[in-house]
Amino acid sequence: MSIAKYLEHTLLKPEATVADIMKLCAEAKEYNLGGVCVNTCYAGLARHLLVGTDVKIVTVVGFPLGADRSEVKALATKLAVDEDHVDEVDMVMNMSAFKSGNYDGVVEDIAAVVEAAKPYAVKVIIETCLLTDEEKVKACELVAKGGAAFVKTSTGFSKGGATIHDVEILAREANRYGIGVKAAGGIRDYETAKAMIAAGADRIGTSAGVAICEDEAKAMGGGLPK
C-alpha cells in the first residue's frame, strides 16, 4: 500500500487561514491521502471541499492541552459529528488528571468523547514527551478502557513529537487491547514516516504529506502513487 493512505495531512496552527485549509484539502485530494486533520472551526469546510472523495475528515477536541471539561469535549465532538460530518475525532487526554493519579477520571473523560462520537472513531493523544515509559503503558490501558480506537503520540504543540521508541511501546500495548496507533509530531520526510510505520504506527499525522509522497515517488523511481 502506498504511504499516502497512512497519512493524515494536518494543519492545526492557530493562524491557519481559509486559503490554507483549501490548499491542504486540494493537496489531500491530489495525492489521495488518507485524511486531513483540522481544527473544529474548519471541519465543515474540509468536508465540503472533500465531498465525493475517500479522504477522511479528522478534527481535534480539547486541543492542545486536554484541560477542557469532559462536557465541553463531548459537546465539541457531537457538533463536529452531527453538523460537520467528520469521520474521526482526535482528543487530548486530561494530562492533569493522569499525572494526579485520577485514572477513573481519565477513562470517564475519554468515554464521554467516545459516546459523543459514535459510531465514529476516537483517537486519544497522550503527549508521550511528557510521560515516562511506565506512564505510556498505563495511558494505553486507559485509552482502551475508555473505548477509543487509537492511541496517538503527540499534539505537536508540546516539547517533543513522535519517536520510534515511543511508537514501539504504544504499538506493543495497543496490540494487547486491539487498538491502533497514530504517530504525530515532527514527521516530515518519507524515511521517518516509513520508520514509524515499521515500528507499528497505523496512521501518520503530518503537515508534510506532499513532501512525504514525493519522497516516496523518488525512492520508488516512478510517478506519484495513486
Residue spans for each PLM region:
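Conserved N-terminal beta1-alpha1 strand-loop-helix module at the mouth
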Residues: 1-84, 137-138, 142-143
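Hydrophobic faces of well-ordered beta-strands that scaffold small-molecule active sites
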Residues: 3-10, 34-38, 56-62, 87-91, ...
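General structural feature for long, well-ordered alpha-helical segments within catalytic domains
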Residues: 20, 24, 42, 73-76, ...
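Glycine-rich, proline-tolerant flexible connector loops at the mouths of alpha/beta enzymes
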Residues: 25, 29-45, 63-65, 89-107, ...
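Generic secondary-structure signature for well-ordered alpha-helical cores
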Residues: 26-34, 48-51, 79-82, 86-87, ...
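Alpha-helix-loop-beta-strand connector modules within alpha/beta enzyme cores
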Residues: 40, 44-65, 103-128, 145-146, ...
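Catalytic cores of alpha/beta
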Residues: 47, 68-83, 131-142, 165, ...
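Glycine-rich phosphate-binding active-site loops on the catalytic face of alpha/beta enzymes
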Residues: 59-63, 83-97, 145-161, 185-188, ...
